[in-house]
Amino acid sequence: MSSGRVGRAVRESVSGLPREFWWLWTSTLVNRLGAFVATFMALYLTLDRGYSASYAGLVASLHGLGGVVSSLGGGVMADRLGRRPTLLIAQTATAVSVALLGFMTHPVAIAGVAFLVGMASNASRPAVQAMMADIVRPEDRVRAFSLNYWAINLGFAVSSMAAGFIAEFSYLAGFLIEAGMTLACAVVVFAKVPESRPAPSARQEEAAVGLGTVLRDGRYMAVVGLSFLVALVFQQGSVGLPVAMGRAGFSPADYGLAIAVNGVLIVALQIPVTRFIEHRDPRTLLVVSSLLAGYGFGLTAFAGSVGVFMLTVCVWTLAEIVNAPTQTGLVVRLSPVHGRGRYQGVYTLSWSVAALVAPLMAGAVIDRLGAGWLWGLCAVVGTGAGLGYGVLMRRLPPERAVGTAAPATAGTEAAAGAGADVPAA
C-alpha cells in the first residue's frame, strides 16, 4: 500500500469525531501510559516485600473486588453528578490511593489500600463510556470506541515495557509516576472536557432510570450475561494461559513472548479492522467474535511449542479486536440517554466479576482435570455466547437513522429525542 493510501486511510479513521472526544481519548492514553502498578504489583509484593504468592493473590482479588463495587457506584455517579465530576473524583482518588499504596508496609494496610485503588480506578469507566456515547454521533460510535480501545492497549503496551526498567530502579518511583500520570488525566479533563450529560429538562417525559430499571431490562441483562461469558474466556489469556504453559515446562519468558502477540496485533490491526467492520451487521460480528474467542483458546489444547501458542493468541486477539467496540456499541444502543451511566456501570460489572471468577475457574479446572479441559470449556463457553448473540440480536429492532450530520452533543441528541438510539426494553 502506498504512503498516500495509508495517509488517506488514517485520515478517514480519525476524521469527523468531535474535539471533546479527542481530549477524552488523550486522557485515556495518558492514563494507560502510566499504568505501571498493575504490571509489577505481584513482583513487588513477592520479591521486594517478601510476601507469599497467596498473599499477592489475595491483594489482587481485593483490588478486583473494589472494581466490582465501584462499577455500579461509578455508573450511578455518572448519571446523578455528571460524567465530568465523576471522572475528576475517580481520577483524583486513584492518584492519591496509588501514591499512598507505595508507602504502605503493613500487610493489612497494603490489602486495604489496594481495595481502594481498585474502587477508584474502576469508577471512571462507566463515565468515560457514557461521555463518549453522549458526544459522538451514533454512526461513529464503533469507530470511536475502537480508537479508545486502541489507546488503552497502546498505552498499556508501552507502560508494561517501561515497568520492568522502573522496577529495577525503584518500585516506589513506579507508584508515584502512575499517581502523577493519573493526576495529569484529571487536569486534562478539568481543563478541556466539558460536561456532556443531557439536561433533565430535555426529556421531561422520560421515566426515571435507577439500578432497578437496568436489572429489570431483560434484553439488556441478557447482553450483560453474554458479555460475562465472553469476558470469562478472554481473561484466560492472563490467568489460565501462564499457568498452563508453566505446567507444560515453558518459562515465564516463553509466556511473555506469546502474550506479547496480543498487544502487538491490537496496536497494529485495531484501526484497519475497525474500518472493515464499522458499518457491518453487529449480530454477525458478535457471533463470529465469540466463536473465534472460544475456539482460539480451545486450540491451545493442541499447542506444544511457543510458535503454536503464539498462533492461538493471534486467533483470539482477532476476536478481541472485533468484539470490544461492537459490544460497547450494542450496550450504548440499548441504553436510554439519561441512564447511560447506570447501564454502562452494570456492563462494566460483567467484566469485573469475570476478572474475579476467571482465576478461580482456571485454577480449579487445571488442578482437578488438567489444562486441556480448561481450553475445551473455553470453546464451549464461546460457542454458547455466539449462539446467545445470534438469538438475541435477531429480536432487536433496527437502529434508526440519524437525522443530522452535526456532532451529537448532549444537547443536540437530547433535543432530537436520541433518535438514533433504540429505547431500552
Regions picked out by a protein language model, each given a short descriptive name:
Residues 180-199, 388-393:
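C-terminal membrane-cytosol helix-exit motif in multi-pass small-molecule transporters
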Residues 148-190:
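Helix-loop-helix hairpin linking two adjacent transmembrane segments in secondary transporters
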Residues 68-105:
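Conserved MFS/SLC helix-loop-helix module at the cytosolic interface between two early adjacent transmembrane helices
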Residues 2-18, 194-225, 421:
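Juxtamembrane intracellular "pre-TM" segments in multi-pass secondary transporters
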Residues 113-152:
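Cytoplasmic helix-loop-helix junction between adjacent transmembrane helices
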Residues 70-82, 269-282, 366:
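Helix-to-loop junctions at the C-terminal end of transmembrane segments
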Residues 85-99, 284-299:
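Structural signature of the two symmetry-related core transmembrane helices
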